């Protein structure tokens, strides 16, 4: 049975997360409903990551097995037609081998978090950024972030409901970009790792925001990390600024031939 990889973009605001839920709308549910328009008996899809309620994606990847050997372009066009008006888009489809798995074949996931410092409400970016009103020191946040790079026990920075077997993860990158915006400043946090713990990114960004605001010293991040205690974490920031940006594989399934 032909297997296809799908690159998916979505606005997470109206959804209870990626994962299919019985009583609430989900991104997985929307994509699977679109697939049923093409093949009513399809077996469902598997994704690279299960984003939480309100979290967005620029490059989520999922795979599906279909009875028909679709032309990838026609498959993406057909799915987008069935997805309307949901804020979900299939950016690309690709024929992949039967050993490809969207989750288990992934080498790296990258996330983007958008934080807007502005007293005025975010109008055009409402629901797409986390807005705070206090000024932030980007150099202090960068200094605090250095303590988190590398392989660590991230118990402090994961949800108490996290189901991962181990809290040990290797964080390959945290970079913070600062750029002026009308009546404010936007900070973009870029994080890369093979995989992340539940709420890890939001816990890290929420903690670094406290460093930027002057409520924490940069070295307090190291102390919190070494505590291996969820109670030592800073506040978990709002989900609407978080984006699953990209998923990397040994070979890019969407690379043009």
Curated annotation (Swiss-Prot):
Assembly and interaction partners: Homodimer.
One Gene Ontology term from the biological process aspect of the record: tRNA pseudouridine synthesis
SUPFAM superfamilies reported for this sequence: Pseudouridine synthase (SSF55120)
Domain of life: Bacteria
Residues given in the record as substrate binding sites: 111
Keyword Transferase carried by entry: no
Pfam families per UniProt: PseudoU_synth_1
Homology family: Belongs to the tRNA pseudouridine synthase TruA family.
Catalytic activity: uridine(38/39/40) in tRNA = pseudouridine(38/39/40) in tRNA
HAMAP family per record: TruA
Molecular function as annotated in GO: RNA binding; tRNA pseudouridine(38-40) synthase activity
Disulfide links within the chain: none
Keywords: Isomerase, tRNA processing
Protein name: tRNA pseudouridine synthase A
Purpose: Formation of pseudouridine at positions 38, 39 and 40 in the anticodon stem and loop of transfer RNAs.
EC identifiers of the protein: 5.4.99.12
Gene, per the UniProt record: truA
Active site location: 52
Gene3D superfamilies per UniProt: Pseudouridine synthase I, catalytic domain, C-terminal subdomain, Pseudouridine synthase I, catalytic domain, N-terminal subdomain
InterPro entries assigned to the protein according to its UniProt record, in alphabetical order: PsdUridine_synth_cat_dom_sf, PsdUridine_synth_TruA, PsdUridine_synth_TruA_a/b_dom, PsdUridine_synth_TruA_C, TruA/RsuA/RluB/E/F_N
């Amino acid at each position: 049975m032909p297997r296809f990889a799908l690159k998916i973009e979505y606005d997470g605001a109206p959804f209870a997360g990626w994962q299919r839920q019985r009583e609430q709308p989900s991104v997985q549910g929307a994509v699977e409903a679109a697939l049923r328009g093409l093949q009513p008996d399809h077996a469902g899809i598997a994704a690279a990551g299960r984003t939480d309620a309100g979290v967005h994606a620029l490059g989520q990847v999922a795979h599906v097995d279909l009875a028909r050997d679709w032309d990838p372009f026609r498959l993406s066009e057909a799915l987008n037609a069935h997805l309307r008006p949901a804020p979900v888009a299939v950016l690309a489809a690709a024929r992949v081998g039967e050993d490809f798995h969207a989750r288990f074949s992934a080498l790296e996931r990258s996330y983007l978090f958008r934080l807007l410092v502005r007293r005025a409400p975010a109008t055009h970016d409402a629901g797409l950024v986390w807005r705070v009103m206090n000024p932030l020191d980007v150099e202090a946040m960068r200094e605090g972030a250095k303590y988190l790079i590398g392989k660590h026990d991230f118990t402090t920075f994961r949800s108490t409901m996290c189901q991962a077997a181990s809290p040990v993860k290797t964080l390959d990158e945290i970079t913070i970009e600062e750029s002026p915006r009308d009546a404010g400043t936007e900070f973009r946090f870029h994080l890369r790792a093979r995989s992340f713990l539940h709420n890890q990114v939001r816990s890290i960004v929420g903690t670094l925001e406290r460093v930027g605001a002057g409520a924490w010293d940069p070295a307090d991040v190291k102390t919190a990390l070494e505590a291996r205690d969820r109670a030592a974490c800073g506040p978990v920031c709002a989900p609407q600024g978080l984006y699953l940006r990209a998923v990397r594989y040994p070979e890019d399934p969407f690379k043009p031939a």
